[in-house]
Amino acid sequence: MHGLLNASKIFKKHVTIVIGKITTCGGDSYCSMDKQCKKLILGIGNHLRSDDAAGSIVARKLKLLGFTSIDAEFMPENYIGVIRKHKPEKIIIVDTCTMALPPGSVRTIPLHKIHGGIVTTHSMPLSAVIQQLREITPKIMLIGIQPETIEVGDTVSEAVTNAINQIVTTISNGEEVNLPML
């Protein structure tokens, strides 16, 4: 794939994913609407802004592996109700973040740093979303990926593609706690 995204294919896939967001659960984080799931991945990203698609791509890849995963694109606040119904024990948010690191760098970001120098590439306040998510579970992790570019485009850089694959493998193996902290 090497990060090449086709906007028309993304749109068609998005329709399918929207239909399956609530009903598709499985893998080691199996859940249904009346059962609590262990881990829910919330991917944030804009597929039309190059590397900014990273969080969404991670969510989609993990969904294919059977994880309870939501591709919230750039509107995570719209999925609070869905997340609440899943009753996750832990929420892992994946997003591109400006961290002044080399492109493709992956870091776990302490939630208190979101108010400080850490900025996601979206206009919505991630701190407000996290505050709402804390009402669901206190176990929230933010994984940030340093983008190379967030200019309008449909190509994810090689560095960020590698980071996406690293995060998918790490979460699949249950080793997200081993990611370096910012």
Please report, for each region that a protein language model flagged, where it lies by residue:
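N-terminal catalytic or cofactor-binding beta/alpha core of small enzyme domains
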Residues: 2-148, 154-182
